[in-house]
Amino acid sequence: MKNLRKIGSKDFPLIVSWYKGHKQAVPDPRALSNTGFIVDNRVAGWVLLTNSNIALIEGIISDPSSIPSLRRESLNKLVGFLIDFCLAAGYTQIIGITKHPRIDLLGKRYGFKTLPDHKILYLNAADDGDNEKD
């Protein structure tokens, strides 16, 4: 696909500026997979591949200063590519996590379903917080 490439270490400062522009927390680079892609220098996202048939699309972010119609076009290209990438690699289940309504709508257009009664649980062993076990 034209204007789509793997994310490299030189892209990280640009992507950090996007997270900051959206007033979102910047992810720890160690938490990002090496299967990240950037489209048109406007949007980026990652695929986390597992040792099962499940892949996770994660970390989709856009340049907040880009023209909205071009950003939407690039986002559509990215999501379509990430899904095709997962399917071509043999993954039959793809999970996406978002709180952004536009990403939610785009996912539904691609056939994703939501689980409205579920919560996302996570554990970050690097947190200094209380990991209380009941």
Describe the residue ranges of each PLM region.
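Short glycine-aromatic motifs
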Residues: 34, 111-114
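Short amphipathic alpha-helix that is part of the acyltransferase structural core
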Residues: 1-27, 118, 128-134
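A conserved beta-strand-loop-helix scaffold within acyl/acetyltransferase catalytic domains
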Residues: 15, 19-38, 43-62
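Conserved catalytic-core motifs of GNAT/GCN5-like acyltransferases
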Residues: 113-127
